[in-house]
Amino acid sequence: MGVRLGKTADKSVIVVEGRFDFQQHEAFRACLDEALERGGGLGLEVDLSWVDYLESSALGMLLVMRDRAKALGIDSIALLGCRGFVRQILVVASFDKFFTLR
């Protein structure tokens, strides 16, 4: 359970497992910092496939990530594995307007 960073040649993938809440803030920020250090030309994705709970602080973390990524020229961020409760929260919060939901 927790947050980890996966990398491929053309993108960074932040994988979140379990509860995505304020307890994950530091780990998420560390992964995001590392992903953004790789450069603005690479893609960025967040894999939420294994998230079973999502709270408002997680939404805030995603918005901060979007702002920081945009400042580096990353315009497209995909949220992967959005299903059930997680997808419902993201759609109700209009995150489908800010991110690609898959």
Model-based region annotation:
Residues M1-V15:
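Short beta-strand/loop segment at the start of cytosolic alpha/beta domains
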Residues R4-G6, L80, T100-R102:
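General small-molecule cofactor/ligand-binding pocket signal
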Residues R19-F99:
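Amphipathic alpha-helical interaction surfaces in cytosolic regulatory modules
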